[in-house]
């Protein structure tokens, strides 16, 4: 059975899949061999490096996950935390990255899991 977080990942995969070969993505797995705290999804998106941490509901990244996302930002990449309610916002951000390719990433990790008012 799919977990709530895996449903968020699936939606993010689908967003990137719309861009075909212009969005090369991998899903790092640790399994004792990789680096703990790596983002759920790492993408080369039209030449831009993007790390995406997917969360369900009000879930927040661990301290190690935030450290890794901040490292991506310091290296010049983009880093986002996305949940099921912010996938649409993330889609708009991807469009913005394409429309303004020379605009540098934000100086902080973009946590898109903020509370939405119903």
Regions found by a protein language model. Name each.
Residues 1-118:
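Catalytic phosphate/metal-binding cores of nucleic-acid and nucleotide-processing enzymes, i.e., regions
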């Amino acid at each position: 059975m799919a977990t709530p977080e895996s449903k968020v990942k699936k939606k993010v995969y689908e967003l990137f899949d719309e861009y075909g070969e212009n969005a090369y993505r991998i899903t790092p797995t640790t399994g004792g061999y990789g680096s703990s705290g790596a983002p759920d999804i790492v993408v080369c998106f039209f030449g831009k490096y993007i790390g995406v941490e997917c969360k369900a509901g009000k879930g927040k990244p661990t301290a190690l996950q935030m450290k890794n996302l901040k490292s991506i930002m310091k290296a010049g990449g983009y880093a986002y935390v996305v949940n099921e309610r912010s996938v649409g916002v993330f889609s708009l951000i991807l469009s913005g990255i394409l429309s303004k390719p020379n605009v540098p990433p934000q100086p902080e990790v973009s946590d898109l899991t903020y509370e939405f008012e119903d």
